[in-house]
Amino acid sequence: MTALTESSTSKFLNIKEKGLSDFKIHYNEAGNGETVIMLHGGGPGAGGWSNYYRNIGPFVEAGYRVILKDSPGFNKSDAVVMDEQRGLVNARAVKGLMDALGIDRAHLVGNSMGGATALNFAIEYPDRIGKLILMGPGGLGPSMFAPMPLEGIKLLFKLYAEPSYENLKQMIQVFLYDQSLITEELLQGRWEAIQRQPEHLKNFLISAQKAPLSTWDVTARLGEIKAKTFITWGRDDRFVPLDHGLKLLWNIDDARLHVFSKCGHWAQWEHADEFNRLAIDFLRQA
């Protein structure tokens, strides 16, 4: 297979959904077969490619059409201030993208904020989802054991409010378990993404005031999710508490949970090979 690059897979389209009128969405696309849409997290400078460049190739080789979507207000997608909880608005953006591309049904893979987006989508559009793969998703309210917000979320908001290379480095150090994976290339790439779109950072903070994290909680509606669900978590996640994985397991009818040891908040990146194998096996099962 020809090596996939960000530029060779980069595309744009416009969607029209509530809160996103004539809105430009950026995405990366490759492969053929059943559609898998991968949804990134909510840290400053995040985007589809930076979140999933270690996953897109193996999924394409496994026979899937893969779409890495930049959520509204992130990376190359249009800027936006949201009056409603972000997971719900992001779910509408996923629906809008699917409508524009003529996709009736898709599997969703979501990390952190992307997981919250996937949960909202599964609740609001149950006939449009295939299977659901979640990695440390947000949107699940308080923890049974840990005071909220966790350390990583505090550093995330600090970086939004005071963008600097040092604050970025502090957040990434909490993000990953294996500190040897933190390279200047990783930090510089994320820092450049932050600097390219300062408007995204300001709008995120304004949106967080209008619809704070407490409004994201969809726990009461998890029982509505009928999609087969594969939940993964990093044992050492310092952004979203591990007991939220149990909350999902208890409330979603057809769910299973895998916990990665020596893993932070970015399972699909930090343990890419194992994650890819487990996730693809899950999608292939009847």
Swiss-Prot record:
Belongs to the AB hydrolase superfamily. BphD family. The active site is at H265 (proton acceptor). PANTHER family: MONOACYLGLYCEROL LIPASE (PTHR43798), MONOACYLGLYCEROL LIPASE ABHD6 (PTHR43798:SF5). One of its GO terms (cellular component) is membrane. This is 2-hydroxy-6-oxo-6-phenylhexa-2,4-dienoate hydrolase. SUPFAM superfamilies: alpha/beta-Hydrolases. The record marks S112 as: Transition state stabilizer. Keywords: Aromatic hydrocarbons catabolism, Hydrolase. Gene3D superfamilies: alpha/beta hydrolase. GO terms for biological process: acylglycerol catabolic process; biphenyl catabolic process. Homodimer. Catalyzes an unusual C-C bond hydrolysis of 2-hydroxy-6-oxo-6-phenylhexa-2,4-dienoic acid (HOPDA) to produce benzoic acid and 2-hydroxy-2,4-pentadienoic acid (HPD). It is an enzyme of class 3 (hydrolase). It catalyses: 2,6-dioxo-6-phenylhexa-3-enoate + H2O = 2-oxopent-4-enoate + benzoate + H(+). Its EC number is 3.7.1.8. GO terms for molecular function: 2,6-dioxo-6-phenylhexa-3-enoate hydrolase activity; 2-hydroxy-6-oxonona-2,4-dienedioate hydrolase activity; monoacylglycerol lipase activity. The keyword Hydrolase applies. The keyword Hydrolase applies. The gene is bphD. Substrate binds at G42, G43, N51, N111, S180, R190, W266. It comes from the Bacteria. InterPro entries: AB_hydrolase_1, AB_hydrolase_fold, AB_hydrolase_sf, Epox_hydrolase-like, HOPD_hydrolase_BphD. Pfam families: Abhydrolase_1. Pathway: Xenobiotic degradation; biphenyl degradation; 2-hydroxy-2,4-pentadienoate and benzoate from biphenyl: step 4/4.
